Amino acid sequence: MASFEQMRANVGKLLRGIDRYNPENLATLERYVETQAKENAYDLEANLAVLKLYQFNPAFFQTTVTAQVLLKALTNLPHTDFTLCKCMIDQAHQEDRPIRQILYLGDLLETCHFQSFWQALDENLDLIDGVTGFEDSVRKFICHVVGITYQHIDRWLLAEMLGDLSEPQLRVWMSKYGWIESENGKIFVCNQEENIKPKNIVEKIDFDSVSGIMASSQ
């Protein structure tokens, strides 16, 4: 199978041309989705084109490919890719087992039920077979949420939220985000007050602008 970069240029031409929604291109686009999953790469535009082709050609619908598209969208949280993809899947197919489970996982992530997410994922690890880097991509999203929510967080809680990480694994993520261990098992995330940057808005109004308004109001 060609690499992601090799396929990207060819797929880009397909998406720009009049054949964007030609069902004969589905096989190429589906292989591209599989390549994204294997190589931890991502192309939202191409993946949305796949889902649109499934809408236009229901007989060609592939549950496995759709599941991979959804999983790749989850790796790009907090962007709204997952919601976009979900809206393009009809209700009947949303009830298919892998798709239903992935939608549930997405709901847990979007509502920040992180411990429940890892528990549900552990019970359905087959869902992410062939999706390289999925768990670490989710951890990046969780760290993003922690970074904008907490000043201090219990060490045990952070480890749980990141999927019951071991001590060395947790230290890697703390180092990545510059989080420092403080006393009593707490981790210093950041000073939220320093993140609030008020803006002073100064608007200059010259006399000509005011005189025009005054004249029109008379």
Curated annotation (Swiss-Prot):
PROSITE patterns in the record: PCI
Residue stretches making up the PCI domain: 42-204
Keyword Magnesium on entry: no
Key word Cytoplasm present: yes
One Pfam family it belongs to: CSN8_PSD8_EIF3K
Gene from which this protein is expressed: eif3k
Family: Belongs to the eIF-3 subunit K family.
GO aspect biological process, one term: regulation of translational initiation
A GO molecular-function descriptor: RNA binding
Function comment: Component of the eukaryotic translation initiation factor 3 (eIF-3) complex, which is involved in protein synthesis of a specialized repertoire of mRNAs and, together with other initiation factors, stimulates binding of mRNA and methionyl-tRNAi to the 40S ribosome. The eIF-3 complex specifically targets and initiates translation of a subset of mRNAs involved in cell proliferation.
GO cellular component terms, semicolon-separated: eukaryotic 43S preinitiation complex; eukaryotic 48S preinitiation complex; eukaryotic translation initiation factor 3 complex; nucleus
Main subcellular location: nucleus
Assembly with partners or alone: Component of the eukaryotic translation initiation factor 3 (eIF-3) complex, which is composed of 13 subunits: eif3a, eif3b, eif3c, eif3d, eif3e, eif3f, eif3g, eif3h, eif3i, eif3j, eif3k, eif3l and eif3m.
Entries under InterPro entries matching the protein: ARM-type_fold, CSN8_PSD8_EIF3K, eIF3k, PCI_dom, Transl_init_fac_sub12_N_euk, WH-like_DNA-bd_sf, WH_DNA-bd_sf
Protein's name in the database: Eukaryotic translation initiation factor 3 subunit K
Location of this chain's protein in the cell: Nucleus; Cytoplasm
Keywords, in A-Z order: Cytoplasm, Initiation factor, Nucleus, Protein biosynthesis
Organism: Xenopus laevis
Classification via Gene3D superfamilies: ARM repeat, domain 1, Winged helix-like DNA-binding domain superfamily/Winged helix DNA-binding domain
PANTHER family: EUKARYOTIC TRANSLATION INITIATION FACTOR 3 SUBUNIT 11, EUKARYOTIC TRANSLATION INITIATION FACTOR 3 SUBUNIT K
